[in-house]
Each structure stands twice: as structure tokens, then as C-alpha cells.
């Protein structure tokens, strides 16, 4: 081998191992440094954890001390409060003991005073007994002396004295009652007049007067013959379909429809006008026209009922009630349209209710429905108050509304104030001038009844009904009747009217006692 090459190889191996040794030494040095760094970091983490643990431990100790101090302070306060309560209880107990001792002392004093009073009272009772015995002796002596002087016994004198006292008392009572009646009458009349006038002035209504017949114009007499038909078949078919009487006489241009049922009469009138306008008049056409007119009248009835309810601001009515309300448009009472009368009563009752602090809406509802029974009294038994009350009860109306319909003519005991309001409004609507009219025979009979009732009473000389029966003037004798007796006669006559007569509004009774003294100068 070449010595130079071998030397070169040796040098190369030497430096190679030397490099490896250097690298290993470097790696070892880096590993040592990393381990030292990790040890330092671990030491730092341990130190930080140790410091944090110390800090938390100190905080826990501080919190525990604060809680302990708070608990101790609370316990101290409770102990102090209990001590204070105990002291207050002790003071109250001491005060009550003092009061008890004082009360016992007062009781002993009162007992001593009572014993002293009983002793004095016993002495006074003995004196009083002696004085009473002496007084009885003196009274007996006086009675014997009075009986001897007057010639009357004790019983006779007492009876005469009682009669005198009774007469004086009756005179005083009559004067007092008369005075208070006049004052009360003035106040009540003034308040009632103001309330009624205010309500009536705030509302004014138009009333229509209907009869039991309706007239229908015909263009020619030939049309009358067509209405009658061959052998009267058309008129018989018409009367059978409508339930009314058709009167055809010599009156030119007029045919009269007569019937007591206003709804049927209106259906007949409308049907006849349609037949005359159409010109075709035969039984089948009559039946068709009457059926159509009946439907139109039914719709008109519902419309009238809804209009009346809306006019007085009443809502929530049953369909049957609205229908019956609309039927009142065709009903009259003493020539007064019942539907307009019901609307007027509703307004008057509502205004009066609001004046005295009641529910105006409920009063208007009661007033509107009070005469609802008049629309069905031809179909059911009983008077219209009972029929109307039954209908409203079945329609789920309030008790106030049902009672107002049943009792607005004073036929039952009044349970609700709305019944009296409706009765008052009903009387106002019926009795105002021009609202109703009655026959001459009925008018004369009512005047005679008023005068005959007044003539029943002793001391009445003459009686005159004036102002269309709204007032009665009674003349009494001044020798037979005193002022107090005249006032009693006036009350009795008014009470008799209320019990025996039925009348709208009120009747004023005036008793006149006149004394005349005549002398002649010569």
C-alpha cells in the first residue's frame, strides 16, 4: 500500500471521528441545557402554585374570620333584642301589677261608698214610704171632698177627663198631620213635577191614530166588479186568504177593508192594491199576492222592531222579541200607537232613571218592552202584562225587565225600582194631552164614578169632577165637618180612588169647607 494514501486515510478517519465526537458533545451539551431549562420552568411552576395556594389559604382564613364575626354580631344583636323584650315585658308586668293594686283600692273605696249609699237609700225609702202613705191619705180625703162637691164618682170624672184629653189629642194630631202632609206634598210635588217636566220636555213624540178599517182606492166601478168576481168567488177567496172583511158599496172610487187584526188588515190592504195595479184578479192570483204581501209585511215588522230598538239604543234582543216589538206598530190603545208609546216610555224612563242615579240603559230596555204582551194577547190567554212577562222570561231577559212588564199596572208587589219608573213613564205617556182619546160614554161614566164615590162620605154636600176627570172638587158642610175632619175626608177619598178605580196619571182631590156668616144692619 502506498504510505501516503494510508496516511491520508488515517487523517480522514481521525477527523471523521473527531467530528462525530464534536457533534455528540454538542448534542449532549444541548440536552443538558434543555434539561436545565425544563427544571427551571418546573421550579417556577411549583413556586407559582405554592404562592397561589398560600394566597387562597389566606383568603379562606380571612373569609372565615369575617363570617365568624358576622355570626357573632348577629348573635349579640339577638341577645340584646331578647334582653330588651324581656325588660319591656317586665315593665308592662310591673305596670299591670300597679294598675291591679290601684283597681283593688278603688274597688274597696267603691264598696265602702256603696255601703254608705245603701244606708242613705234605705233611710230615704223609709221616708218615702211614710210620705206616700201620707199622700194617699190626703188624696183619699181630696177625692171624697171632690166627689161631694162635684156630685161625680172618681170613675166618672176620669172618663170625662179622658174624653177631653182624647178630643184635644185628636185635634192636635189632625193639625200636625195636616201641616206635615201639606209640607210633604209641596216638596214631593215640586220634585216630581221638576223631574217629569224635565223628562217630558227633553223628549217629544208623534202619535198616530188608527182605526179598524182601511180604504183602498179603485179607478173605476168596473174594477169593483172584477174584485167581486163571478158569483162573488174573488171576494170570497180574498176574505178567506186574508181573514178580513171586504166591503164594496156604492161609495165611488173606494173599497173598504175591515178587520180587528191590524196585521191582517194591512196584508189585505197591500194585497188589494197589488191586485188592482196588476189587473189580473182570480183566486190563484189572490193567494199568490196575499202570500207575497204577508212576506213583505213580516219583513216590515222586523224592520220596525229593529228601528225601535236602535232608536232607544237597546241591543241583544231575541228575534222573537224583535218581531213582537214590530207588531206593536200595528197596535193601538185608545188610538195611541203602541210602538211609539213604548219608545216614548223608554225615553222617559231612561231619563228619570239617570236623574235619580239608576241605570238608564236598563230603564230604557224595561220601558221599550213593557207592553210587548199587547202584540200577542189575541193568541194567548191572560192580560198583556202576564203574556209579556212570560214571553220575556222565555227570551232570557233580566228579572228587572220581566218584572217591569208584569207589574207596570200595579198588579203585583213591586220588587225593583225600574217597575215604578216604567209605571210612571207609562202614565205620563198615556195621560199627556193629545196622546189618547176615549169614547163619550166612557168619559161620562168615569165622571159619574168619581162623583158617586165622593158622595159616600158623611158631611159631603156636593162633588164635581172637573178637568176631564183629573180633579175632583168636594164641598163639605162647615157645621158638620171640622178642618181636621175635612183633611181626613180628602185622604179617604183619594185612597178609595186608588183602591177601586183604574186611571192613567193622577186625580187631584180638593175638599172645600166654607163657613158663611150673614147679618143685617138696620
UniProtKB/Swiss-Prot annotation:
Q: Where is the HD domain?
A: 338-431
Show the GO cellular component annotation of the record. plasma membrane
**Compartments in which it is found:** Cell membrane
Its membrane topology: Single-pass membrane protein
Keyword Cell membrane listed? The answer is yes
Transmembrane ranges? 7-27
EC number(s) per entry: 3.1.-.-
Instruction: Family membership, please give it.
Output: Belongs to the RNase Y family.
Q: What does this protein do?
A: Endoribonuclease that initiates mRNA decay.
- The protein's name: Ribonuclease Y
